[in-house]
């Protein structure tokens, strides 16, 4: 239909400038340059690049991009031709092919419309839904096949729970060891006092030796705490810095991923709209005026895909490094814990083995039960006070028969 009008329809460029240019591409072994073409007669006055495939001559060269208009092939104009005819023209050329183009100077911000933002929000909501739930709510579900980062994220959450549990358990363990060391210290102080006050030399030496053993155990406990405490610092660094940093990177990755999926969905909707109108014989205004809106979305999709690929690569590398650190760090920390506790128990066993002083012989009769001339009778302070109160409150009575001091024969004498 545009052949009859000689393409005199004014193009609606939406304020997007174009810059002409040309590029020479060396074809690959399959005689391809790695682009797909859209537009052309009979509904669109221009032909444009829909997609540049990865690892192809066009992608490696980087000159042309999605949305750029193709104006000629090897100096031959393609005006009024269909996309199939232009594809054949490119295929007929062997070796190098020169593509003449009009570079679309598009700003990605122009493509970030409210529709794209709403699509990103919808993708966030649908991401964690099952297929059945999404279908029941009437929501289309655009997903990336074989997206292993979803499983990696689940593994990261499990690793975070593991480190959190290890941190709490280690804190409780250190607290228990600290209280145990204080108990050993108290034991040592008590036995040391007993040893100092014990009149029997052998028993005194035994109590002091047993006290020193408990004080040594207390020192072993403090040494254990100083050795294991850095383990908490390392675990907290991994738990509170490395994992949150990876989560933040994953959130950025998901944002780029949802943006890319939103542009893909937008392109699909615009394609369906165009096919429906063509089927009805009513071409769209945007198509008949150069399809610049569609080409802008194509450019935005390509740039979003590039950001998505780069971000995905960065996330995979970071998670790989995090996994390696997790494997190495967890082994090192557990070895430190086990070796430190083993040394602690071995040292405690060695000290207590050398301090095997039981049974201890103590002359209780000599120390607490024997009464002699030079020993004072044991009296309780409270009983003395009661006796004084009684003596003050009662009248004087005959003291005959009252208990007197012990004589040399050990018998009581009258006063």
Swiss-Prot record:
Tell me the subunit arrangement: Monomer and homodimer. Interacts with CXADR. Interacts presynaptically with the glutamate receptors GRIA2, GRIA3, GRIK3, isoform 3 of GRIA4, isoform A of GRM4, GRM7 and GRM8; with NAPA and NAPB; and with BTG2. The interaction with NAPA and NAPB disrupts the interaction with GRIA2, conducting to the internalization of GRIA2.
**What is the annotated localization of this protein?**
Cytoplasm, Perinuclear region; Membrane; Postsynaptic density; Synapse, Synaptosome
Q: What is this protein called?
A: PRKCA-binding protein
Q: Where is the lipid attached (S-palmitoyl cysteine)?
A: 413
Locate the compositionally biased regions of type Acidic residues. Answer: 377-391
- Write out the GO biological process terms: cellular response to decreased oxygen levels; cellular response to glucose starvation; dendritic spine maintenance; dendritic spine organization; glial cell development; intracellular protein transport; long-term synaptic depression; negative regulation of Arp2/3 complex-mediated actin nucleation
Primary localisation category: cytoplasm
Could you state one GO cellular component term attached to this entry?
synaptic vesicle
Residue segments, region Disordered: 376-415
Q: How does it sit in the membrane?
A: Peripheral membrane protein; Lipid-anchor
- Modification note: Phosphorylation at Thr-82 appears to inhibit the interaction with AMPA receptors. Palmitoylation on Cys-413 is essential for long-term synaptic depression (LTD).
